[in-house]
């Protein structure tokens, strides 16, 4: 009996690329999934290597122009957005590797989100409010930070993970797990403990959830 291959989209959003904690944790999760009998097909979207276009007036105008009226230039402008949305639609599992920058997400990730949140494509409005259109997916947020924003006194400063959860829910993805790798700048012992705990959580996700 064969099991259908699951498609995994890994979105890396650290500008430090190969020296990124969140990226390394995403790679660790991929390695754990590869050790399972279930087959996975991985797509890596590294926003440091291929940044999403910055949302400007030309993009805004192109997004709200009917498809049949798009000029050749506008077709080129909307091409990255359509590619990103197709990747979301075809993925079974979406992994967002997200370092915290100034209490929120990176500029790279914000530009990507501006490209995928499109009315009629990833969400729509009706009488009862918005409805997400990217349904039936699982998502994992890997949140890394130099400080520890998991404590009672600090968690209110974390604008990263609540925002990402909201965006995912908004476009229809409600099955979301978050793995934290916080305290990486608080000394070697704290960093080692956080890394070990995150790896354990990722192993558990790979074995029991994904």
What residue ranges belong to the model's regions?
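Gly/Ser/Thr-rich active-site loops/lids in small-molecule metabolic enzymes
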Residues: 116-121, 162
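Residues at the starts of beta-strands that form the adenosine-phosphate
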Residues: 6-7, 41, 137-139, 175
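Cofactor-binding loop segments of dinucleotide-utilizing enzymes, especially the Rossmann-like FAD-
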Residues: 13, 144, 181
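Glycine-rich phosphate/pyrophosphate-binding loop and the adjoining helix
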Residues: 2-3, 151-210
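Short, well-ordered alpha-helix to beta-strand connector turns
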Residues: 91-92, 136-137, 173
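Short, glycine-/small-residue-rich phosphate/pyrophosphate-handling segment
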Residues: 125-170
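N-terminal beta1-alpha1-beta2 submodule of the flavodoxin-like/Rossmannoid cofactor-binding fold
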Residues: 2-98, 103-114, 118, 200-210
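Short histidine/acidic/glycine/proline-rich micro-motifs that form metal-
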Residues: 15-17, 147-148, 185-186
């Amino acid at each position: 009996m064969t099991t259908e291959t699951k498609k995994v989209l890994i979105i890396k959003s650290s500008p430090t690329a190969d020296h990124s904690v969140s990226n390394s944790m995403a790679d660790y999760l991929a390695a754990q999934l590869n050790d399972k009998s279930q087959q996975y097909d991985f797509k890596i979207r590294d926003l440091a290597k291929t940044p999403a276009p910055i949302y400007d007036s030309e993009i805004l105008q192109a997004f709200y122009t009917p498809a049949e009226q798009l000029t050749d230039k506008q077709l080129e402008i909307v091409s990255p957005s359509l590619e990103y949305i197709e990747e979301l639609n075809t993925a079974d599992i979406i992994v967002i590797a997200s370092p915290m920058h100034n209490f929120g997400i990176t500029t790279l990730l914000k530009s990507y989100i501006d490209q995928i949140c499109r009315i009629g494509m990833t969400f729509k409005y009706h009488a009862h409010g918005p409805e997400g259109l990217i349904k039936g997916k699982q998502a994992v947020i890997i949140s890394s930070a130099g400080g520890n924003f998991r404590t009672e006194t600090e968690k209110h400063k974390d604008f990263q993970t609540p925002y990402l959860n909201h965006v995912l829910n908004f476009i229809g993805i409600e099955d979301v797990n978050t793995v934290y790798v916080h305290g990486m700048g608080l000394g070697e012992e704290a960093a080692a403990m956080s890394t070990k705990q995150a790896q354990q959580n990722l192993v558990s996700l790979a074995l029991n959830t994904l």
